[in-house]
Curated annotation (Swiss-Prot):
Protein source organism: Escherichia coli (strain K12)
Keyword Chloroplast part of the UniProt annotation: no
Gene name tied to this protein: lipB
Entry protein name: Octanoyltransferase
Site (Lowers pKa of active site Cys): 135
Lineage: superkingdom: Bacteria
Pathway linked to the protein: Protein modification; protein lipoylation via endogenous pathway; protein N(6)-(lipoyl)lysine from octanoyl-[acyl-carrier-protein]: step 1/2
Signal peptide start-end: none
Reaction(s) catalysed by this chain's protein: octanoyl-[ACP] + L-lysyl-[protein] = N(6)-octanoyl-L-lysyl-[protein] + holo-[ACP] + H(+)
UniProt-annotated binding residues for substrate: 71-78, 138-140, 151-153
Gene3D superfamilies the UniProt entry points to: Bira Bifunctional Protein, Domain 2 (3.30.930.10)
A single GO cellular-component term on record: cytoplasm
NCBIfam families referenced in this protein's UniProt entry, alphabetically: lipB, PRK14342.1
Length: 213
């Protein structure tokens, strides 16, 4: 019988492409008995272009590589100091629709930021989480065979300047924010556990096993 348990992998700082490839392989080979997984990772500097991404939104990438991704959404930036959380969930088994998963991920971030005294909100016209008009978390998913992969990227204490080289998520002039603007002591090390606790709460507190790379 299937046990509701999630494997949580803390992967540290990693290049984007091998992690993306591993996500695909996991999703392609999983079956109904495979445990769901959540991967916590930071990436070396990279722009990723979503499936519907338009080249004109990449203004001047310079020395930062641009990699095509099959997630939803437009171009975004990943770099050290940004907490990425990939959600490898069997949606059918969890009785979750895609829209419900998006809402759950946004609420995970809103709840995490609320614990820090930062008031944040999602936007109906542009997926992600915002503080005022500034975007603090990007979101992009792919569903294959009823299972999700990709996830969210929360700006913690990263260098935001590379976002100026693109139209983030396809919005010209979109301003970005990071947690350390309000909480200078914030790091991915102290934000990741909060993020994990909040998503597990919204998934009805399944058992989980923590695995470090």
């Amino acid at each position: 019988m299937y046990q509701d348990k999630i494997l949580v992998r803390q992967l540290g700082l990693q290049p984007y492409e091998p992690i993306s490839q591993a996500m695909h392989e996991f999703t392609d080979t999983r079956d109904d008995s495979t445990l769901d997984e959540i991967w916590l990772v930071e990436h070396y500097p990279v722009f990723t272009q979503g499936q519907a991404g338009k080249a004109e939104h990449i203004l001047m990438p310079g020395d930062i590589p641009v990699i095509q991704s099959d997630r939803g959404g437009q171009v975004t930036y990943h770099g050290p100091g940004q907490q990425v959380m990939y959600v490898l969930l069997n949606l059918k088994r969890r009785k979750l629709g895609v829209r419900e998963l998006v809402t759950l991920l946004e609420q995970t971030v809103v709840n995490t930021l609320a614990e820090l005294g930062i008031e944040a909100h999602p936007r109906a016209d542009a997926p992600g989480v915002y503080v005022g008009e500034k975007k603090i978390c990007s979101l992009g998913l792919r569903i294959r065979r009823g299972c999700s992969f990709h996830g969210l990227a929360l700006n913690v204490n990263m260098d935001l300047s590379p976002f100026l080289r693109i139209n983030p998520c396809g919005y010209a002039g979109m301003e970005m924010a990071k947690i350390s603007q309000w909480k200078p002591e914030a790091t991915t090390n102290n934000i990741a556990p909060r993020l994990l606790e909040n998503i597990l709460a919204l998934l009805n507190n399944p058992d989980f096993e923590y695995i470090t790379a």
